[in-house]
Amino acid sequence: MRAGTLWRVLALWLLSVAAWGQEDDDHADDYTQKLFTVSISGTRVVLTCPVEAEGGDIHWERDEKSLPNTKKELDLTDFSEMEHSGYYSCYVGTKNKENEHILYLKARVCEACMEVDLTTVASIVVADVCVTLGLLLLVYYWSKNRKAKCKPVTRGAGAGGRPRGQNKERPPPVPNPDYEPIRKGQRDLYSGLNQRGI
């Protein structure tokens, strides 16, 4: 199959999928226009019925019990999760399955709550990371400068416990006659070690 033909088939397929998806969206628009609107502010919850009242009152029910409100909005002040949670329904005229809209509501509210948007949360996180990195660099440079000002400590060497480097405080030890090196001109008992002829 040639590349030009492949592109034409792909374009035709994409157009048919887009047209098919648009038909489904037309039916979805009818459904999405009939959704409840829920507004929460502090301890106040307001439900808005998706039905338009054409000359009639809107009836509200909670868990199959009628509520006294006949307006489009149901205002629940001092909302309590235990008392006010449940199935809410609204309808115009007589109740039947075609004109009844049902919503299950379970909300948590508080008086002193504060809503924080995404930019505020992101700026708090960025500021926290910057402060942490600043403190890390401060401690690093402080410890580096402190280490440079300190005198080097001499540590004891292996078996003798003598310092490894030249010690300026005491002179080198006096040579012990038991361990003096063998003189070149003198021929002693051990002066010929490791000098075997091979």
From Swiss-Prot:
CC per GO annotation: alpha-beta T cell receptor complex; external side of plasma membrane
Single annotated GO MF: transmembrane signaling receptor activity
Span of the signal peptide: 1-21
Ranges in the topological domain labelled Extracellular: 22-120
Keywords from the UniProt entry: Adaptive immunity, Cell membrane, Disulfide bond, Immunity, Immunoglobulin domain, Membrane, Phosphoprotein, Receptor, Signal, Transmembrane, Transmembrane helix
SUPFAM superfamilies, alphabetized: Immunoglobulin
Subcellular location: Cell membrane
Region (NUMB-binding region), start-end ranges: 166-183
Subunit structure, as described in the record: The TCR-CD3 complex is composed of a CD3D/CD3E and a CD3G/CD3E heterodimers that preferentially associate with TCRalpha and TCRbeta, respectively, to form TCRalpha/CD3E/CD3G and TCRbeta/CD3G/CD3E trimers. In turn, the hexamer interacts with CD3Z homodimer to form the TCR-CD3 complex. Alternatively, TCRalpha and TCRbeta can be replaced by TCRgamma and TCRdelta. Interacts with CD6. Interacts (via Proline-rich sequence) with NCK1; the interaction is ligand dependent but independent of tyrosine kinase activation.
Name of the featured protein: T-cell surface glycoprotein CD3 epsilon chain
Species, as recorded: Oryctolagus cuniculus (Rabbit)
